[in-house]
Amino acid sequence: MARKARMADIFSHWYHLIENFQASAKEFYAAVEAALQRRQIPDLKTSRVDWREGGLLSAKREYLRIKRKELVFDISAAPFGTGFFFSWWLGELPSGFWALVSIIPFFGPLMELFLRRHTYYKADTALMFQESVRAAVNEVIDQMTSAKGIRALTDLEKKPILRELYRR
């Protein structure tokens, strides 16, 4: 059962539409979870979350959420016309004390700026988390497409879009 999601501060995104291809999102999510388990990523948690397709009364879409500390991936797989698309969004979702601080007008951002340290280690582990999940997603997509005789994605097609990771 999926739960209502909280929005993360997104800093990386990837998507790809595969024409003339159909698959099961639930099977894709289960295969990604298995691929991640084999990688033994520390502090990893998975769940299903619901995101609305539009406004308040719109339908909900189930995503696979992969969380490690304050970093979250929301992964989607869904039909689109005669094709099927895959996408993921990677962001930061503050928890605990910093979640409370982040909602304080004016002072919250100042406290984060001066008291919350962004280190090389945090940047490195964020990139390793992204790379591990990206590799798992690509592995599963390659397995699914090759099973149906569809060419594998190129390296360029697998490349994520990074935003502001180093400006944190």
Residue ranges and their predicted role:
Residues 1-168:
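A composition-biased, non-transmembrane "mature-region" signal
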